[in-house]
Amino acid sequence: MAESHRLYVKGKHLSYQRSKRVNNPNVSLIKIEGVATPQDAQFYLGKRIAYVYRASKEVRGSKIRVMWGKVTRTHGNSGVVRATFRNNLPAKTFGASVRIFLYPSNI
């Protein structure tokens, strides 16, 4: 039997983009596992992100739902990236895992 391979890299939803007094929920900050520099983070620009969660009500035979987004640019010097989602991620997802898919590929 063929070995299964993950098509995504794990990441954490850190926070919204913010300043001293104002936060911007349109832009989420994502820390990608194994990425420590802005140069490493460049690879992930344009990649798709999914926040997968379980809901209490079943829709079309499944309780699992997904919120989709995209990596837009890097943020800071520690390899964090900015991402926008079709619907903003709720604040209760701070610290939650997200999946950064390895497509669309630009290699």
Swiss-Prot record:
Q: What does this protein do?
A: Component of the ribosome, a large ribonucleoprotein complex responsible for the synthesis of proteins in the cell. The small ribosomal subunit (SSU) binds messenger RNAs (mRNAs) and translates the encoded message by selecting cognate aminoacyl-transfer RNA (tRNA) molecules. The large subunit (LSU) contains the ribosomal catalytic site termed the peptidyl transferase center (PTC), which catalyzes the formation of peptide bonds, thereby polymerizing the amino acids delivered by tRNAs into a polypeptide chain.
Q: Does the keyword Hydrolase apply?
A: no
Q: Where is the signal peptide?
A: none
* Covalent cross-link Glycyl lysine isopeptide (Lys-Gly) (interchain with G-Cter in ubiquitin) as placed by the record, residue numbers: K47
Q: How is it modified after translation?
A: N-terminally acetylated by acetyltransferase NatA.
On the tree of life, the source organism's domain of life is: Eukaryota
Q: How does it assemble?
A: Component of the large ribosomal subunit (LSU). Mature yeast ribosomes consist of a small (40S) and a large (60S) subunit. The 40S small subunit contains 1 molecule of ribosomal RNA (18S rRNA) and 33 different proteins (encoded by 57 genes). The large 60S subunit contains 3 rRNA molecules (25S, 5.8S and 5S rRNA) and 46 different proteins (encoded by 81 genes).
- What organism does the UniProt record list as the source? Saccharomyces cerevisiae (strain ATCC 204508 / S288c) (Baker's yeast)
Q: What else is known?
A: There are 2 genes for eL33 in yeast.
Disulphide bridges, residue numbers: none
| Entry-annotated residues carrying N-acetylalanine | A2
Location of this chain's protein in the cell: Cytoplasm
Q: What is this protein called?
A: Large ribosomal subunit protein eL33A
**Which PANTHER family does the record match to this protein?**
60S RIBOSOMAL PROTEIN L35A
Q: Which GO terms describe its molecular function?
A: structural constituent of ribosome
Which protein family is named in the record?
A: Belongs to the eukaryotic ribosomal protein eL33 family.
One of its GO biological process terms is:
rRNA processing
UniProt keywords (A-Z) are: Acetylation, Cytoplasm, Isopeptide bond, Ribonucleoprotein, Ribosomal protein, Ubl conjugation
One term under GO cellular component: cytosol
Q: Which PROSITE patterns match?
A: RIBOSOMAL_L35AE (PS01105)
